UniProtKB/Swiss-Prot annotation:
Disulfide-bonded cysteines: none
Descriptive protein name: Probable terpene synthase 3, chloroplastic
Location within or outside the cell: Plastid, Chloroplast
E.C. number(s) listed in UniProt: 4.2.3.-
GO biological process, one term: regulation of defense response
Family, per entry: Belongs to the terpene synthase family.
Cofactor(s), by name: Mg(2+)
Keywords of this entry: Chloroplast, Lyase, Magnesium, Manganese, Metal-binding, Plastid, Transit peptide
Annotated binding of Mg(2+) 2, by residue: 329, 333
Function: Probable terpene synthase.
GO molecular function, one term: terpene synthase activity
Residues where Mg(2+) 1 binds: 329, 333
Length: 574
């Protein structure tokens, strides 16, 4: 299931599944946030559009204690004072960069953007990049690359730590746990090119020696921190999830190595965000019950918390709270014949509620909700940012349903697509492009000035959108989505790849798919850190979405999502 903020959204699986050619299950329609869709005559609920306007008008902080925000503001002032003193004392050297890294890892760096930018501009970070200390050099590299600076992993850092005779990493690094952690973090910021092979070696070297360090480490807190870093690499993991573990590690250090004000601010931020998420969750559950679709359509899956987790992960921070609420989406199975699905698609193209009158009851309700929610989101974007994205959003819906129809026709005609064709279409039917377009509109991303530019983002999908979509589709298709409980043939990339390569085993197919996922991460890194075509908040949404995928689809042997359970407990449970 897929749920994201700022827009309506479609299911990750979003594929045609059936055991006969005359009918199909399609996981499409995302119904977002407090929709004002007309309820069926037998459902007596309040006008759902009112909830959207109520939430938009009210501040998310109203239900939180003023004293909590006063505490947060006071702690922020304390940390800013400390940063200025540290900058003046060290000129932005190692101590300052370690503090910046801690602020980022604790998800409180947004309070100190000006101070961080000032420290990065001093040149101290560049000087540290050329240090002979592995920890210093890898930390400086990561901070510079994340900020979009042009740095070379090979020339600026790694060549100094490679033995000139053997060509391997120096043996003296084997016991440098902090340096190895930095090397491991750095290795995941691969943007391809000449550095790719060396960063891959750095990843293997650091992983191997860190695994040994865990076994022989006499410091339990450090051992757990290393284990967490290996299981959940910093760049590939949700920063909110990693933040709690990082704080726990910082709190285990000697008092002389700790920043008390930073830790207190992190705790205050965690508590405020948890209260905010709990409030949002209550509103979402209320909206879902009012919508009544779980009763109206028997196959609808009622997993509101899981859907909300997508929204919470992609748009992090209290400033995005309104958009998370607008976007609470659902993915539900829509049962229908090929002809009915075609009629539904045509109704979407017409974008007129009257066009849905001939549809079956459940489809009609879904269509009207979809129509109303999308128009509401367009109105919100228009009011806040001055341009109305409705034409772009309408076309995005048409593209999505055209993709669904491609899959429906494959099934109805017993056509077996190539793995490549399936994946190309699966990027669209993942729902990620549609959702991102809604998010871009909600966040006020520059409205294209011409119709040609407006259509380009849909017809010629940029990698910042296609990469998370492919990552999601491939993860889901590796067979880990056991909770979908779907019957019939479940066409997937792995199925079609094995049909094309009968000599390959399922394990080899999975290894191939993991390789494709790694390749998409490299391309996503290149877009976010090198090209930087999109604003940083848009890039962060796309990175967070890609990071959330493994959380949603990594099942253990008992078919439980342990990381998701842990993350939900951290962010939502009292």
């Amino acid at each position: 299931m897929y749920s994201l903020p700022g827009a309506t959204m479609s299911a990750a699986p979003a594929r045609v599944i059936s055991s006969s050619s005359s009918s199909s299950f399609v996981e499409p329609l995302l119904l977002a946030a407090a929709s004002s869709a007309a309820a069926n005559s037998h459902h007596q609920v309040r006008q759902r559009g009112h909830l959207v306007r109520t939430l938009a008008a009210s501040s998310s902080s109203n239900t939180l204690l003023r004293s909590d925000f006063d505490l947060q503001e006071g702690l922020t002032t304390d940390v800013k004072r400390m940063l200025r003193q540290r900058q003046k004392k060290s000129g932005g050297g190692r101590e300052m960069l370690v503090t910046i890294d801690n602020l980022k890892r604790l998800c409180i760096d947004h309070f100190f953007e000006e101070e961080i930018e000032g420290a990065m501009a001093t040149g101290a970070c560049t000087r540290l990049l050329h240090s002979d200390d592995l920890f210093d050099a890898t930390l400086a590299f990561r901070l510079l690359r994340e900020a979009g600076h042009d740095v070379s992993a090979k020339e600026d850092v790694l060549r100094r730590f490679i033995d000139g005779v053997s060509g391997d990493f120096k043996l003296s690094l084997n016991n440098d746990v902090r340096g190895l952690l930095g090397l491991h973090d750095m290795s995941h910021l691969d943007v391809g090119g000449e550095e790719a092979a060396l960063l891959h070696r750095a990843k293997e070297f650091s992983s191997s020696h860190l695994a040994s360090a865990v076994r022989y480490q006499d410091n339990p807190s450090l051992a757990e921190y290393v284990r967490q870093s290996l299981d959940h690499p910093y760049h590939l993991s949700l920063t909110q999830y990693k933040a709690r573990h990082h704080l726990r590690y910082l709190q285990s250090l000697p008092s002389s190595c700790r920043d008390a004000a930073v830790e207190r601010l992190a705790v205050a931020e965690f508590q405020l965000n948890k209260s905010l998420h709990q409030r949002e969750m209550r509103e979402i559950k209320r909206w879902w019950m009012d919508l009544g679709l779980a009763e109206e359509i028997p196959v609808v899956r009622d997993q509101v918390m899981k859907w909300y987790m997508w929204s919470m992960a992609a748009l992090q921070g209290s400033s995005f709270s309104r958009y998370r609420v607008y976007v609470v989406d659902d993915i539900f199975d829509l049962v229908g014949t090929l002809e009915e699905l075609s009629a539904f698609t045509e109704a979407v193209k017409m974008w007129d509620t009257a066009a849905a009158d001939s549809l079956p009851s459940c489809m009609r309700s879904c269509y009207k909700a979809l129509h109303t929610v999308t128009n509401e989101i367009a109105e919100i974007a228009h009011k806040e940012h001055g341009s109305n994205p409705i034409n772009r959003l309408r076309k995005a819906w048409v593209v999505l349903f055209d993709g669904f129809m491609v899959e429906a026709r494959w099934l109805a005609t017993d056509q077996v697509p190539t793995a490549e064709d399936y994946l190309r279409n699966g990027v669209v039917t993942s729902g990620v492009p549609l959702t991102f377009l809604h998010i871009f509109s909600m966040l006020g991303y520059d409205d294209p000035s011409t119709e040609e530019e407006e259509e380009a983002i849909i017809d010629h999908m940029p990698s910042i959108i296609s990469c998370p979509a492919k990552i999601l589709r491939l993860w889901d298709d590796m067979g880990s989505a056991e909770d979908e409980a779907q019957e019939g043939f479940d066409g997937s990339y792995r199925d079609f790849y094995l049909m094309e390569n009968p000599s390959r085993s399922p394990g080899e197919a999975e290894a191939h798919m993991r390789g494709l996922i790694a390749r998409e991460w490299v391309e996503l890194n290149r877009e976010c850190f090198c090209r930087r075509t999109f604003p940083s908040d848009i890039a962060q949404v796309c990175l967070n979405t890609a990071r959330m995928v493994s959380v949603m689809y990594s099942y253990n042997k008992e078919q439980r999502l342990l990381v998701l359970e842990d993350y939900a407990a951290m962010m939502l449970v009292l």
